[in-house]
Amino acid sequence: SNINIFVGNFEDIEKNMTEKYDYITLIGVFEYAESYINSKKPYIEFLRIVKKHLKKNGKIIIAIENRLGLKYWAGCKEDHLGTYFEGLEGYREDKGIKTFSKNELEDIFKLVGFYKYNFYYPYPDYKLPITIYSDEYLPKLGELNNNFRNFDLDRVVTFNETEVFDSIIKNNLFPIFSNSYLIILE
């Protein structure tokens, strides 16, 4: 069989993992590292552990919300904790989960020894993307007009997201305010 499925606490399972992999996917997983990695720097330690299981030229694929995503400024609740502005305010308490900005993620990657990575920008987010943008192909004015996709939580509307996205695009800031990221680490 080409697929092995492991269920349980990552630290317990990882001790028995001996294989190396071409690809490791962390889809909606990385943000929970402080819940299952016993370390003062759980996000760094988690990536270090995962990196040990990559084959030469292997890749890690991460999908994660951007804590500075425009949807949070516009009135969506933080996806995991269900509260307004939690990520924008820097997660004042450790609650077992944390998302990151692009710069914060890049800092973590470099501390772990990943210097080659590509960011992609799923729109409206990675869970149900309509389009995936890249640094080579960023959105154009008027393209980001499908912004009312907060399926599981109530939201308020604080401004017209399409107009604000257009302003962000004009100022070359879309990678900073994308609602989520799809990242390939090499």
What are these regions (language model features)?
Residues K59-Y84:
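Conserved class I S-adenosyl-L-methionine
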Residues K116-R155:
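Conserved catalytic loop of SAM-dependent methyltransferase domains
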Residues R149-I184:
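Conserved Class I S-adenosyl-L-methionine
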Residues N2-D12:
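Conserved SAM-binding strand-loop segment of SAM-dependent methyltransferases
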Residues D94-Y121:
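Short alpha-helix
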Residues T25-G28:
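A conserved beta-strand element that flanks and buttresses the S-adenosyl-L-methionine
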Residues S39-K59:
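A short glycine-rich, Lys/Arg-flanked "PGG" loop and its adjoining helix->strand segment in the class I
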Residues D12-E19, E34:
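Short conserved loop adjoining the S-adenosyl-L-methionine
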